[in-house]
A protein has these predicted regions:
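Short helix- or helix-capping micro-motifs
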Residues: 118, 137-139
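Extracytoplasmic/periplasmic ligand-capture domains
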Residues: 3, 8-129, 145-176, 180-304
Length: 309
């Protein structure tokens, strides 16, 4: 609660989950900051915009879905970030582990996962949900030095439909695909307090209906969402200037043999990431992270396992 540092500001007060108050450091070696006191409030994007409307804050980080709304006394600043949104697709068939449902019989087929990825029109989603303020995301590390551009694809619903046909999911009389009497259905979860992810989930569901998948959405609290994501898609938010994002999402855990947030395992992918962490050469480690994404024969991209979109 009393960190020692040499930066422009010192921690004056920290109310966990509510706010942080910073004061200018009189001993700072450089030019003194013009703002002598900064209060940072912890609030979600919707609450931040409400604070703007009420004139309670000077600056707010909020959702792009509010970008088309004007507020007197405020101007819009669009910043490029590595922040991204996406969803998991459980990559193993249904099973039970320690009393928890794990896996999904529909998304465990790699052809289905590839079809879903091809069916998503990211540009359309940016316009519909984010008012044009965004860029297509193909991984959790777009634009980073360790990003493998082989992850990039173009929306192709004809090819998506062909892949589903190949996987045995045939369009029925009601327009919904079936296989062995089972409907092609998916429920997309989103954090109940996140309006942007709710809208992204709804847009995703609507797009997948175009290829015969009966998709729906449901809000969930984080007290249950982590467990539910072991067997169905959940809209996640990622973005960090570290390749550990890849490790945390895709590397299998020793106790379960599967990745932490959604069931998936690939020993070759694990090995590349382990070698990257053990490397004492930064540039060489980046190449290993890239190979974990796609090495020409396996990985986590469209031509590989594609367990996240």
């Amino acid at each position: 609660s009393h960190p020692v540092g040499s930066g422009r500001y010192m921690l004056k007060q920290w109310d966990r989950g509510q706010q942080v108050i910073l004061e200018a450091n009189p001993g700072y070696y450089g030019e003194q900051p013009k703002m002598k006191r900064v209060t940072i409030l912890f609030m979600d994007e919707d609450a931040a915009f409400a604070a703007v409307k009420a004139g309670q804050v000077d600056l707010a980080y909020t959702a792009a879905s509010y970008a088309d709304q004007e507020t007197a006394g405020y101007s819009l600043l669009a910043c490029e970030t590595v922040d991204n949104r996406g969803f998991n697709l459980p990559a193993v068939p249904v099973m039970e582990k320690d009393g928890l449902k794990v896996g999904n019989d529909f998304t465990s087929d790699v052809l289905v996962r590839r079809a879903i990825n091809l069916a998503i029109d990211r540009d359309e989603m940016i316009q519909n949900v984010l008012n044009g303020y965004g860029s297509p995301a193909f991984s959790v590390c777009d634009k980073m030095p360790w990003y493998n551009s082989d992850a990039e694809i173009t929306c192709d619903r004809d090819e998506a439909a062909r892949l589903l046909d190949e996987a045995g999911w045939i369009v029925g009389a009601d327009g919904i695909r079936e296989k062995d009497g089972v409907k092609a259905e998916l429920e997309f979860l989103y954090p109940a307090d996140d309006s942007v992810r709710q809208a992204l989930a709804a847009d995703t569901a609507n797009q997948l209906k175009e290829i015969g998948i009966n998709a729906s959405t449901r809000g969930a609290g984080w007290d249950t969402a982590y467990d539910e994501a072991q067997s169905q898609p959940l809209l996640w938010g990622w973005g960090a200037h570290t390749p550990m994002e890849l490790y945390n999402i895709y590397h299998s855990m020793e106790d379960t043999g599967l990745a932490a947030y959604s069931p998936y395992a690939n020993k070759t992918v694990d090995q590349y990431m382990d070698e990257a962490l053990a490397s004492d050469n930064l540039e060489e480690s980046w190449e290993l992270w890239k190979k974990a994404q796609w090495d020409g024969s396996t990985g986590i991209t469209q031509e590989g396992d594609i367990p996240w979109i």
